[in-house]
Amino acid sequence: MEIKCSERLIIPKEYKTELDLKETAIAIKEVKDCFERALAKQLNLIRVSAPLFVRCDKGLNDNLNGVERPVKFTVKDDNEAAVEIVHSLAKWKRMALYRYNFNADEGLYTDMNAIRRDEELDNTHSIYVDQWDWERIIKKEDRNEEYLKDIVRKIFKAFKETEEHINKLYPFLGEVLPEEVFFMTTQELEDMFPDLTAKEREDAITKEKKAVFLMKIGKTLESGEKHDGRAPDYDDWELNGDILFWNPVLNKAFELSSMGIRVDEESLLKQLKLANCEERKELQFHKMLLEKKLPYTIGGGIGQSRMCMLFLKKAHIGEVQSSIWPEEMIKFCEEKGMTIL
């Protein structure tokens, strides 16, 4: 049975935005400018230009959960070469670090735009994706959990700095982040809440802790289920995670970032086999990785519009980004006090 868009929406009781359209536009820029500077400083990153589309035969696009269809087209003046709009730049960034000759503990970030045509549209999901995609070179010996946690803490400092900046400009919005981030694995979370679904578990722990880094996503848990899917060829499933914040407007856990230490040659082979995707070994990116030509890296994506939603207390992602929405959803949101851009 088809589910109406309005039935997927969370409608906060007596919702009323604190900022009008013009004020929102100004505040969005404040959020983005502040966080971009803070992230670059914390992680020693420089900004680089990023592609909107990549060639299909290079293996550079992010396959996400493995079922999402990329938008494809051909280029007339390049012998009708097949290209596809990116889902994210997870693999492209690692290749870029190699080409730019970055050193260990240096990295890059991009202002990434993507189209995810198969997203189910609701308060937090849009077919238009805008995020900071970042990647940083690490040493082989840095491929461990403590290094991962250290990077997460640095990113959390950038979040805190941004929230404090926005709260000085708009004190009536209030702050939502705690003083520190809480770390937990997906298996520990399943053990704690065995009778809940994955999303219900995230809600339960994030409501309590307010800021959580949920680790080890993509692997099969003791229950025989995965907490969530991850492509086998960028994150190491033992060394990755999601940054979750409690969203008081929507009353649910809110994913702001998916990130991780990237696969090395051993974990790539292992995960490709587990995912039944061993044919990818013949793609350019994968060949270079297996031949140890690419640097060891850590990286992730951080949602720009979701961050604006959280800090500006917005109930729908369409209040902070311009995208395409069903007319039914636009009308329903307007009736409930959510002005879609």
Curated annotation (Swiss-Prot):
* Broad class of where this protein is predominantly found: cytoplasm
Q: Which organism is it from?
A: Clostridium tetani (strain Massachusetts / E88)
User: Does this UniProt record's set of keywords contain Amino-acid biosynthesis?
Assistant: yes
Q: Where in the cell is it found?
A: Cytoplasm
- Give the disulfide map: none
List the SUPFAM superfamilies: Class II aaRS and biotin synthetases (SSF55681)
InterPro entries associated with the record: aa-tRNA-synth_II (IPR006195), aa-tRNA-synth_II/BPL/LPL (IPR045864), AsnA (IPR004618)
Which CDD domains has this protein been placed in? AsnA
Please indicate which superkingdom the organism of origin belongs to: Bacteria
Q: State which Enzyme Commission number(s) the record gives.
A: 6.3.1.1
Swiss-Prot/TrEMBL GO biological process terms = L-asparagine biosynthetic process
Tell whether Heme is among the UniProt keywords. Answer: no
Instruction: Offer a single GO CC term for the protein.
Output: cytosol
Which pathway does this chain act in?
Amino-acid biosynthesis; L-asparagine biosynthesis; L-asparagine from L-aspartate (ammonia route): step 1/1
Q: Which reaction does it catalyse?
A: L-aspartate + NH4(+) + ATP = L-asparagine + AMP + diphosphate + H(+)
What is this protein called in UniProt? Aspartate--ammonia ligase
Assigned protein family: Belongs to the class-II aminoacyl-tRNA synthetase family. AsnA subfamily.
- PANTHER family assigned to the protein according to its UniProt record, in alphabetical order: ASPARTATE--AMMONIA LIGASE
Q: Which UniProt keywords apply?
A: Amino-acid biosynthesis, Asparagine biosynthesis, ATP-binding, Cytoplasm, Ligase, Nucleotide-binding
Pfam families cross-referenced by the UniProt entry:
AsnA (PF03590)
